[in-house]
């Protein structure tokens, strides 16, 4: 006889997860789990059902892969029959903290720990679905094995979104981040219809109520820089921006744990306690101490905790429109300035480009291994509509509110990776503080022609010699050569966008 457990408390879910051998309790009180062969998202296993009501609005391709509607129905029924014979966990949550723009979701999971994950990352409302909206369903059977020949999937696991039926199916997926990002993709499709820009960004607010957004790909400092002891956190990853509001799409944080320390990340460290989940981290068999430096399972170790675990947060989970918007890039070529001031068109250009640079090899070796990465809207895997839809909405929001936009390089200066040096965290924090304090809203600038960027001539607390990157290199000619290489990559990447000429003109210039 199988049981359905409805809307269990955190303590009960932890208790059942331990009783069912789904994880272990760490010395800090968190539940430690492993996710098997998948320790990150599986883009090749993510699909959107192709059906008439949404087919013309989705940007189909290697990211948004089509799935047959009849095959979806058959697989959903198969997974539902499978999970009906097991103990299962059901929770009722919201995705989106705005009273107008939330989605009510019935989440059914095969494991207790993934239900706890959903309750940590989504929003646990005081009353479920007060506006009586149409309900979405998540069906998550982690131990179900798909058969590609029978099910039409790519492998033994899948994530499939069906907009027409308001269903999200996860089968064979132990990595819980898939569930969070699937619902982000759902909101990223739906919100633009309501004049709301969905954003892959973190957000915080000053004590006087001024909101700041941080966009950036993994490793650029989004989570670290938004966790500011002098400001209140709204959220660390997913937000919507509509007329009069910035709201969190989530109710929790999903932070990277690699090399986590109390000294460097006190807010995250303190949030990992009873009720939090730690994913793919080794723990000592005797003391049960987590070892965040051990990457034998993955470098993508994570912790999932509710926002209640962050002391200095915005209780309502939303705030006013942003005074300041920061695009973070970790430029390992050393070409970009530490801070640039962007016009609305330049903001659209860099938003569409979504540039950062990674070391291509896992061995942090020579600078020849550098790889420039362009991820549209600073989160290409999660945006189902054509990119221009989001860029136009960004410019509209900036125009209507008058937000100031900045490009901040948290990467290298004085030369590429291996030759130059990384901007220190105090330097980056001084730049962020100057932006948030309004010190750069109206300042004298220098125009860098090739990059087509405006750089402030003075930033409080920052060495003026760092502001123009060309002057920090030993050889200006060497810098110019590297700059042209990077500019050529920007230009080549931007050819895929069909946007207004004014946006193209706001980008770097080859030659």
From Swiss-Prot:
Its main location: cytoplasm. The keyword Lyase applies. Mn(2+) binds at residues 181, 200, 237. Keywords: ATP-binding, Cytoplasm, Decarboxylase, Gluconeogenesis, Lyase, Manganese, Metal-binding, Nucleotide-binding. It catalyses: oxaloacetate + ATP = phosphoenolpyruvate + ADP + CO2. Signal peptide: none annotated. Binds 1 Mn(2+) ion per subunit. Its EC number is 4.1.1.49. The keyword DNA repair does not apply. Substrate binds at residues 41, 175, 181, 302. One of its GO terms (molecular function) is metal ion binding. GO terms for biological process: gluconeogenesis. Coiled coil: none annotated. CDD domains: PEPCK_ATP. Pathway: Carbohydrate biosynthesis; gluconeogenesis. It is found in: Cytoplasm. GO terms for cellular component: cytosol. ATP binds at residues 181, 200, 216-224, 265, 302, 428. Its cofactor is Mn(2+). InterPro entries: PEP_carboxykinase_ATP, PEP_carboxykinase_C, PEP_carboxykinase_N. Monomer. Belongs to the phosphoenolpyruvate carboxykinase (ATP) family. Involved in the gluconeogenesis. Catalyzes the conversion of oxaloacetate (OAA) to phosphoenolpyruvate (PEP) through direct phosphoryl transfer between the nucleoside triphosphate and OAA. This is Phosphoenolpyruvate carboxykinase (ATP). It comes from Marinobacter nauticus (strain ATCC 700491 / DSM 11845 / VT8).
């Amino acid at each position: 006889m199988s049981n359905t457990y409805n809307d269990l408390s955190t303590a009960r879910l932890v208790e059942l997860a331990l009783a069912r051998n789904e994880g272990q309790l760490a010395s800090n009180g968190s539940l430690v789990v492993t996710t098997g062969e998948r320790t990150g998202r599986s883009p090749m296993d993510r699909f959107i059902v192709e059906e008439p009501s949404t087919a013309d609005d989705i940007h189909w391709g290697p990211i948004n892969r089509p799935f047959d509607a009849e095959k979806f129905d058959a697989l959903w029924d198969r997974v539902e029959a499978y999970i009906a014979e097991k103990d299962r966990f059901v929770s009722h949550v919201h995705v989106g903290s705005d009273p107008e723009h939330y989605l009510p979701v019935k989440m059914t999971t095969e494991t207790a720990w993934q239900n706890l994950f959903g309750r940590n990352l989504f929003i646990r409302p005081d009353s479920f679905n007060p506006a009586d909206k149409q309900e979405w369903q998540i069906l998550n059977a982690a131990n179900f094995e798909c058969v590609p020949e029978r099910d039409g999937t790519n492998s033994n696991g899948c994530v499939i979104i069906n907009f027409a039926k308001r269903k999200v199916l996860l089968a064979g997926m132990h990595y819980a981040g898939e569930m969070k990002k699937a619902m982000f993709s759902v909101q990223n499709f739906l919100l633009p219809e309501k004049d709301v820009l969905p954003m892959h960004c973190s957000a915080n607010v000053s004590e006087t109520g001024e909101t700041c957004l941080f966009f950036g790909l993994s490793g650029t400092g989004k989570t670290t820089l938004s966790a500011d002891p002098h400001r209140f956190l709204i959220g660390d990853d997913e937000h919507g921006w509509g007329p009069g509001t910035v709201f969190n799409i989530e109710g929790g944080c999903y932070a990277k744990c690699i090399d986590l320390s109390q000294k460097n990340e006190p807010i995250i460290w303190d949030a990992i306690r009873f009720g939090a989940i730690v994913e793919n981290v080794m723990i000592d068999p005797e003391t049960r101490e987590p070892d965040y430096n051990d990457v034998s399972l993955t470098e993508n170790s994570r912790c999932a905790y509710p926002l209640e675990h962050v002391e200095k947060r915005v209780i309502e989970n939303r705030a006013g429109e942003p005074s300041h918007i920061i695009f973070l890039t970790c430029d390992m070529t050393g070409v970009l300035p530490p801070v640039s001031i962007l016009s609305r068109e330049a903001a659209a250009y860099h938003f569409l480009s979504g540039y950062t640079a990674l070391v291509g090899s896992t061995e942090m070796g020579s600078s020849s291994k550098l790889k420039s990465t362009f991820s549209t809207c600073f989160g290409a895997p999660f945006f189902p509509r054509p990119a221009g839809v989001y860029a136009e909405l960004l410019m509209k929001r900036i125009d209507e509110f008058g937000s100031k936009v900045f490009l901040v390089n948290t990467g290298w200066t004085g030369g590429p990776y291996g030759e130059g040096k990384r901007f220190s965290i105090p330097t980056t924090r001084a730049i962020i503080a100057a932006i948030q304090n309004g010190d750069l809203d109206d300042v004298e600038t220098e125009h860098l022609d090739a990059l087509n960027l405006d750089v402030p001539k003075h930033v409080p607390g920052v060495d003026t010699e760092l502001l123009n990157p060309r002057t920090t290199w030993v050889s200006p000619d060497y810098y110019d050569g590297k700059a042209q290489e990077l500019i050529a990559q920007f230009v080549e990447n931007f050819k895929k966008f069909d946007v207004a000429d004014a946006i193209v003109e706001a980008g770097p210039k080859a030659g």
